[in-house]
Each structure stands twice: as C-alpha cells, then as structure tokens.
Amino acid sequence: MNFLHSTLDRLREFTPVSNTSTFRTNGQITPEEFVAAGDYLVFKFPTWSWADASPTSKRASYLPAGKQFLVTRGVPCHRRLDDDFAGEAGHDETVVGDGEDFRGTGHSPGDDEDGWLRTGGLAASQEARARDVRTVDESGEMGEREDDEDDIPDMEDEDDDDEAIIRDPKADNANSSRRTYTIYIAYTPYYRTPRLYLSGYLSSSQPLPPHLMMEDIVGDYKDKTVTLEDFPYFSNNIKMASIHPCKHASVMKTLLDRADAALKLRREKQKQGKTVPGAKDTGMEGLVDDFEKTKISDKKAMLEGLKAGGNGNDEWEVLQHDQDFASEEEEVAIRVDQYLVVFLKFMASVTPGIEHDFTMGV
C-alpha cells in the first residue's frame, strides 16, 4: 500500500499547475497563495523559515527560488502513541467528515474512511467532577470529599528508598522517550494543498529510523493516511513520514465554513447588544477573536500577536479582516494568507504527541 501511494504521488507531481483561486469554494490554494501563507507563517512565527531545494535541480518551477518549502526544527515529542491511544486522559475519539460539525459525536475511526479522527473529548474538569463523590447527611449538608482509593498511600510504596536505588545513567539515556522532529511543509500541485513531512531524531540527536516515526502517529492513520515517502526537494532520498493530502482541502473547507458561521453569529449578537465586553464565548463563537492587521502585501507591518478566543480549551484560532480591508458583507473569519496557521492546528490531530504549538509561540 505504501509503495502504491508513493508511485502515484510521483506521477501526480507532473500535474499542470492551476493559478485560479478556489480557496473559498473548496479549500484549495494556488502556488501564489501558498507563498503568501508561508510568508505570513514565517513573519508571525520565526521558528518557521523558507528553504530552497538541494540541489537546485530539484526546484519546482511554480515556486520562487528560496521559497520551495517551509521548515522548522527541534520540535519536541515526549511520548509514544500505541494503537489504543484516544487522547489525553482517555478522551473519546470522534471523526470529522466532509461538511460535518467538528464537534460531532457518535462515530468511531472505522465508521467513515473518508473522515479525519479528532482525539480528545472529556475535559479534565469534567473528569474531576466525575470523581468528586460526596455524601449528604440527614440535615442536607454536603460532607467532605472522600479520598479516592488511588489517593490512599500504599505501605509498600514506603518501603523503597529512592536514594538507595542505584540507577544506570546509560540505561536511562537509552530508554529516554524524548524525541525531536524537523517538520517540512511542501506544496502539492495535484491536490492543490500543503503537505506535511516529518523527520525524527532520538534524544541522542541520532536520526530516527523511519518505521519508528509511526510510533508517534495515531494508530488509525498508520499506513493509511500517513506513509513513508522521499522528500521531493532533496536528492539523497531521505525517508520521512508524510501525511497524505487527499482530504486536506475538504476538511479545511469545513473549518472555513464553520468559522464564517461563527463570526456571522457573533456580529449579529454584537448588533443586538447581546455580547458582554470581556466575556468569553463558548463553542465555535469562542474561536472568533478580532484583531487588527494589514494586508500581507503591506511590508511595513503585519501582526503584533495572535489572540485566541474561546473557553481556554479551544484549539482553533479564527482570524478575521480589519474593517479597512473589506466591507462587513465580505468579512470572513480566515483569510487565505492565514491558511497555514489553521492547517498546522488540523495536522496536530494526527500527531498529538508532537508539540506543534512549540513552533507557533510568539
């Protein structure tokens, strides 16, 4: 299966390039829009940078020299994912289908092969409340919370003296679970979307064997959505884990539509005076956070900061137009030059152990 994907992808690289923008209609972007989105990402998050093909004969003619792909290095990954991984703290899994509510439930990874798995469900605060079992006395007063069995010290735990245990430092280093990744973003002319490539390193800075990179991929994606591929801009045929772009455009279109709907709802509430200054919205409305910006073509200034809306648990940041940039009727939540910011948040659902937000710190 991996060989078939690789062969087809090499043939698809010869697809004629389209320069017609269809970003708002189907989530696809042109090479020019990819460069604009890359410029925004590099300006906003300096851990990212543009890079050139090596050798130059590997350059794609539809992209400028020196801006063939984007790269960030040293991204930490502290844990491995097994096949039963379902998000932190045993969170449920949901599948995001084309045009479907990102918060929808009732699916499992195998129900919809065309969907994308979103890990996580039950919030930590909800889990804590489920454990918070208390008694009520005859007068109706609530008693103190009873200790969980896991909270009661075990006498056997007190027997071992940590200072008396002789540890082998070499063994600790060899078994260290910490890895780092170099992340690449390239453009695919066939799917007209970005494509993510991952190259891993052990804690000792030694290259991570390609098959071990799959330990950091959510189980349902292994060999199906994520395959091992040669990076097209290098001549030494370095195998990398690559997230196949066949569904990127449709999922991005879903996110664009939902963000626009949330922004429209927020504007209506503002007109009716239903919003409270400083209050935090929940759900998709909480993703919309206004901020000032200029056009990406204006080289004098771009952005001072990326502000996240929502209830503190939201992963997505929805960006909007300055009033001077477009009329209210044309206002959208996510512009094309902000595409890669949302794209990386989307990609994080495939590799939740890799700290993608590390690359997006201000």
Curated annotation (Swiss-Prot):
- What InterPro entries does this protein map onto? Atg3/Atg10
Q: List the disulfide bonds.
A: none
Its cellular-component GO annotations read: cytosol; phagophore assembly site
Q: Where in the cell is it found?
A: Cytoplasm
The source's superkingdom equals Eukaryota
Q: Where is this region: Flexible region?
A: 84-168
Which residue ranges does the record annotate as region Disordered? 85-164
Per the UniProt record, one Pfam family is Autophagy_act_C
In the UniProt entry, which residues are flagged as the active site? 246 (glycyl thioester intermediate)
Q: Where is the composition biased (Basic and acidic residues)?
A: 85-104, 128-137
Q: What is known of its domains?
A: The N-terminal region is involved in phosphatidylethanolamine-binding and is required for atg8-PE conjugation.
Record family assignment: Belongs to the ATG3 family.
Q: What is this protein called?
A: Autophagy-related protein 3
Name the gene for this chain. atg3
